Amino acid sequence: MRKDVVLLVGGAQGSGLETTMQVLAPAYASLGYGVLANREYFSNIVGRHSYIHIRVSSSGEARPLYYPADFLGAMDAETVFTHWDDIGEGAFLLYDLGTARMRLQQIASMEPDLRSRLMQQYREAGIEPFTVEKVVEYLEREKRVRVIGLSFTALFDVLIKKHGLSRAQAQRFRSSILIGAIAGLTSLDREALDLGLQRRFGSRPKVLEINRDFIASVADEVEKEYGAQLKLEPAEPKSGEYVVASGNDVVAMGKVVGGVRYQAYYPITPASDESVLLEEFEGLKIDGESLGSIAILQTEDEIAAVSSVIGAALTGARASTATSGPGFSLMVEALGWAGKNDVPMVITYYQRGGPSTGLPTRGSQSDLLFSLFASHGEFPRIILSSGDHLEAFYDAIEAYNLAERFQMPVIHLLDKFLANMVASVPFPDWKAIKIDRGKTLFKAPTGPFKRFPRDQPLADRPVLGSGAITWYTGDENDEYGHIDEDPVNRLVMYERRWKKMEIADREIPEDFRVKYYGDEDAEVLLVGWGSVKIPALEAIERLREMGVNAAYLHLRMLSPLPKRRVSEVLSRFDADRVIAVEANYLGQASKIVTMETGFMFRKYILKWTGRPVYLHELVEGVLDIVRNGRDKVVLSYGK
């Protein structure tokens, strides 16, 4: 038995890969295992190559992804060709015998660059002709890979005969073959597997029953023939409940708990899933009792979305939008209007690869500096960045609290990696959740109201309809909101806005904004933000086992940066032992740290391919810097 198993399943977009993840993740999680799963896919509805990367851990916690995988399940020939070098010694490969004679040159959906690289790699390995059969033979011979060759056509024939399906209908159960094989090799408890199936197909009884039968038959055949070679140790005992959800899901959940009453959006990857889930909660009820409603509006564009959010926030509603890079680019003028007028709106920003359309379905951390300086002029904003699923849940709530308490826009930064990763997440601690509406007034004295008093950076905020008469304009204004270009007024009002940031810097606890992980006497410090936290925490454990005492400094709030605490931690380390780890080219967070503290980074581990930072390559990168004196390591693993 093993502590972890890493699974890789691939196939054409639209062939049921996501179903594999949706069934297996809750099945393993229900047994107490930690699960983390990532889906990589092209900007394409049907046909292009897509794959799911899953790690199941007996530790009970969702652990970071790494290669090589213990199992590769190939729905098509392209998966075998593409991922032939992603599996380790003695791993399992399941493939369709019907694809054995397929040639690499026949894969029309494969990008030319990848095909050329694979041809070169195959020639160097002595794999010719370039067929699935030859690749499989090589893996058996050179890497002792245990091959499970199944005739998908024969399996579908049985399915057609037994359940009266058409050939086209039977093809829809392609992912069930992979689920069955994985269930057999890991000896997955059938009740747990059934839980996963019911979660996915519970509303379609006939489809559920066919899947149960088909998956069980494949699982029995594979386990009988190959044994439960990937069986996991029993999960370590843990307390409390867990939920299986993506980053998009937990942010939506957090917003509901945090009291969102209005969200506007224009569809964009990878942000849309959050708003789509929120639409399911438009009418809030518990035990039949209505708790109110959420208005979710899909607007004609991002300008309309953010502008309507501003309007909703001025009425006193907790209001937000969710977007990605191109959408945020359209929102920046309205962001400036909100910053100038003390509007407490929230922008949930899921980063993807840019510039322009860039890599619309791939991840990135390249928009941090853009978030910090977006829109013309100078005005305060809070930038909060979540490192994992649980942080994303709490941060979705805290973003509203911070926006209303400090009366400024809050940008909640996430990335595609976290958005699309599905994880087993500890159920939130309700006692830790607090709602802070700041100085919001729902009833105020009637008549003209000093919304922007010169001597009060954080003044009472009467909402529209409260009775008070308030004015909001894009021009510089006086205390009542009327346009006023007087230089003395300009001086005072400008400072008034920035004093809010000074107050936020004093009042937001530093232990919330930054977290140090590791031994106090560590010799190497990794500094990162966002989803880098996921691989970094296990990386420092592995490095310690390899004789490198490393720690991780997680930057959760980038504006205002907790510069005093960050400076104190950095001062304990030799500059050559401090490594910035980021999924961008410039090392953007390190530049903010330098700007705020004066500390000059000399060492970098960076990645900008659009694929996640994997555990194994991060560990290798740190060792390369520590042992070989490298200044910069560029990571590139992933297909």
UniProtKB/Swiss-Prot annotation:
The Tyr-Pro-Ile-Thr-Pro (YPITP) motif is important for the turnover of the reaction, presumably through its flexibility and mobility. Substrate binds at residues 269, 352. A motif (YPITP motif) lies at residues 266-270. GO terms for molecular function: 2-oxobutyrate synthase activity; pyruvate synthase activity. This is 2-oxoacid:ferredoxin oxidoreductase 1, subunit alpha. The lineage of its organism: Archaea, Thermoproteota, Thermoprotei, Desulfurococcales, Desulfurococcaceae. It is an enzyme of class 1 (oxidoreductase). GO terms for biological process: response to oxidative stress.
